[in-house]
Regions:
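Short coil/turn connectors at secondary-structure junctions
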Residues: 127, 160-161, 168-169, 195-196, ...
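A short, polar/proline- and glycine-enriched secondary-structure boundary/capping micro-motif
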Residues: 112-116, 183-189, 219-220, 245
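Zymogen propeptides
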Residues: 2-157, 161-163, 173-174
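Domain-core and long-helix interface of multi-subunit machines
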Residues: 193, 201, 205-245
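Short acidic-glycine loop/turn motifs at beta-strand connectors
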Residues: 95-98, 166-172, 203, 228-232
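Structural recognition of the beta-strand scaffold that forms the well-ordered cores
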Residues: 129-133, 165, 227, 235-237
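Active-site-adjacent helix-turn-beta-strand microarchitecture at beta-sheet edges
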Residues: 70, 132-212, 217
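Short, solvent-exposed aromatic-acidic interface loops
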Residues: 107-111, 178-182, 239-243
Length: 245
C-alpha cells in the first residue's frame, strides 16, 4: 500500500494521545489525552482561518452507512481490516468532497497537559463517523500545536522534529521545526500541525531506515498513520497493540 501513496505519511504511537476524526458534517477532527491532567485553556472545535471553511456544526445525510462504508455529501469512507504477524490492521480510505476539510478536537475541549478522554467520547461530542488517535502534544512541554487554525503552542521541541502540516485546501507538508516557526506556518495557512513522526513516505519514496523506525516499533504498542494519496484523498492506518483481544 505504501508504494501507492503519492504524498506523505506520518507514523505515531497511539498511546492515549490525540485523535483524528471524520466529522458527520464537514471533515476530519482530532483529539488528545494522557495521565495527570492540567488545563491551560478551553479549545473551540470550530475552525479559525482567514479563508472560507466548512463548520463542523452543519448537517449531512448519509446515503451509505455500514460497519465498513460510509458516504454523505461531504465524504466517502471505505474500511478494510487485515491481519499481519498476529496483529489486526485497520485501513480507512477517505475521500473528502467540496470545501469539507480535516478537523481536530481536543479531549474535553481543553488544551492542556495530559487532559484525558476516550477517543469514542470525544468523537461522539463532535458527531464524528471516523476517529483515530493522533500525536503526543499533551505529554510534552514543547512541539508546535496548531488546531483548527488556532496557534496553541509555538515552542519548538527539537530542530529536527518532523511535523505534519495540514493546510486549508487539504494538502499535506512535512516540516522540521528548525526550518520554520509555528507562527510562520500559521501565516502560510496551516490549519493543523501534528507533532509526531518520523515521516514514513515522502514523494512516493520510503523516508525512514532502521535507525529511525525499527527500534520504536519493537514494543507492542498501537500505531497509527495518515497519508495523502492525491487531492483530498487520504489513507488512515491503525494497528492494534497492547491488548489481549
Amino acid at each position: 500500500m505504501s508504494n501507492k501513496l503519492k504524498g506523505k505519511s506520518l507514523r505515531k504511537a497511539l498511546t492515549l494521545a490525540y485523535s483524528i476524526l471524520l466529522v458527520g458534517s464537514s471533515g476530519l477532527a482530532v483529539l488528545d489525552t494522557l495521565f495527570i491532567s492540567k488545563s491551560y485553556t478551553k479549545f473551540s472545535n470550530e475552525t479559525t482561518t482567514t479563508s472560507q471553511s466548512t463548520s463542523s456544526s452543519g448537517t449531512s445525510t448519509a446515503t451509505v452507512n455500514t460497519a465498513t462504508a460510509y458516504e454523505d455529501d461531504t465524504k466517502v469512507i471505505a474500511i478494510e481490516t487485515y491481519e499481519r504477524n498476529s496483529t489486526q490492521i485497520h485501513v480507512a480510505i477517505v475521500t473528502i468532497k467540496g470545501d469539507a476539510s480535516i478537523k481536530t478536537a481536543l479531549a474535553d475541549e481543553t488544551y492542556g497537559r495530559n487532559v484525558k478522554a476516550k477517543t469514542s467520547t470525544t468523537a461522539q461530542s463532535v458527531n464524528a463517523v471516523l476517529a483515530v488517535n493522533g500525536d503526543y502534544y499533551g505529554a510534552r512541554d514543547a512541539g508546535y500545536v496548531i488546531r483548527n487554525g488556532q496557534l496553541l503552542r509555538s515552542d519548538s521541541q527539537d530542530a529536527n522534529q518532523e511535523d505534519l502540516v495540514i493546510y486549508q485546501d487539504g494538502s499535506f507538508e512535512i516540516i522540521r521545526e528548525g526550518d520554520i516557526t509555528a507562527q510562520e506556518l500559521l501565516n502560510k495557512g496551516a490549519v493543523q500541525v501534528l507533532t509526531f513522526g518520523p515521516a514514513l513516505i515522502e514523494n512516493s519514496q520510503v523516508a525512514v531506515d532502521s535507525t529511525d523506525e525499527v527500534g520504536k516499533a519493537m514494543a507492542s504498542n498501537p500505531r497509527t498513520a495518515i497519508g495523502v494519496i492525491d487531492d483530498k484523498h487520504y489513507v488512515l492506518v491503525v494497528s492494534d497493540g497492547r491488548t489481549d483481544e
